[in-house]
From Swiss-Prot:
One of its GO terms (cellular component) is cytosol. InterPro entries: Trm112-like (IPR005651). This is UPF0434 protein YcaR. Belongs to the UPF0434 family. It comes from Escherichia coli O81 (strain ED1a).
């Protein structure tokens, strides 16, 4: 995942900043508590593909 991409893309739900979780290979929106998957290194920024973060994940 190219970190320069994170400077360009935004959450498709709230237009907020996104964070990369290397361990889970996900792009995270902390404002909406959503995790977007990476497929073959490409972020899938579709709300229908996102999962809701657990309470523990939201805290970190």
């Amino acid at each position: 995942m190219d970190h320069r991409l994170l400077e360009i893309i935004a959450c498709p739900v709230c237009n907020g900043k996104l964070w990369y979780n290397q361990e889970k290979q996900e792009i995270i929106c902390k404002l909406d508590n959503l995790a977007f998957p990476l497929r073959d290194g490409i972020p899938v920024l579709l709300e229908t593909e996102a999962r809701v973060l657990t309470a523990d994940e939201s805290k970190s």
